[in-house]
Amino acid sequence: MKVTEYYTVRHLLAATCSLACVALLAIGANAGLDLRAPEAAKTVFTQETGSAIQLALIIGNGNYPDAAEPLSQPINDASGLAYAMRRHGFDVDMVEDATKADMTRAVERLKSRIKPGSVVMLFFGGYGVQSRQETYMMPTDAVIWKEGDVRQEGMSVETVLHAIKERGARATLAVIDASRRNPYERRFRSFSHGLAPVSAPSNALIISSNTPGKVADDTKGQHSVLVTELLNNLNAHASAEGVFNKTRVAVFRASNGAQMPSVSSSLLEDVHLNPGDDPDLTTSSIAPITTENADDPSPTSPLGHPGHP
């Protein structure tokens, strides 16, 4: 073989080996990515993936100008429940000390995200007032001097629940912690204590902090008795109706019989607050907490703060 031919063959062999090495490195890199991808997918589902499946609007109102002093528990209750519901896969919008405009915007945000098949939770903590056998959630800027003001200034629980139903929600859950003795009760003769029975739309489950017409004064704890017992029972492997009924009994016992929450259900199927217990909620449709935020109890809402559209 000539010297020139020898060097040509040698160069070709070297080039071939180099290309083979590059190919092997590329295959190895892709294999590494493929191995990591499934694990990453377990912890980095986007919240958009589950936004139409489990939604919660949580409102905590504590600073009412007409009250002798602020309510400390509703905001603590809202923060604690928001954190717990995020841990259960809910996409949570929490608002604190909401005015009527804030509450209206929050409900509109919620309605815009509901799709057929959604499970939706509504929580309200603060002052509630009944008028004409209907319960109204009071915003912090409510000005109440006569019964007509309640309907004008407040937000009807039933109206919100029916709006959720009309958007195609699979099921609606409501926790109304508003049976407190409120600062408006002596301003008009026709005032009725406590909350009115809530007329639930179909496929809804509602728990109120006390029997209709009865008041429930706040305790000295960080959370109200209702929210304390609800948080204690959320991890039970039971349907939402089972959780609410367990909470009802626990509140009655914790208050030594002074407080008996009212539970109303028109559910047509089992709904579970633990995603793993619900066959209709697969891991691909749950909005989980990402790894970097899993230990952060911050109540910051991904949907914005009060006053933000």
What are the residue ranges of the model-derived segments?
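Cysteine endopeptidase catalytic domains of the caspase/legumain-like
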Residues: 2-309
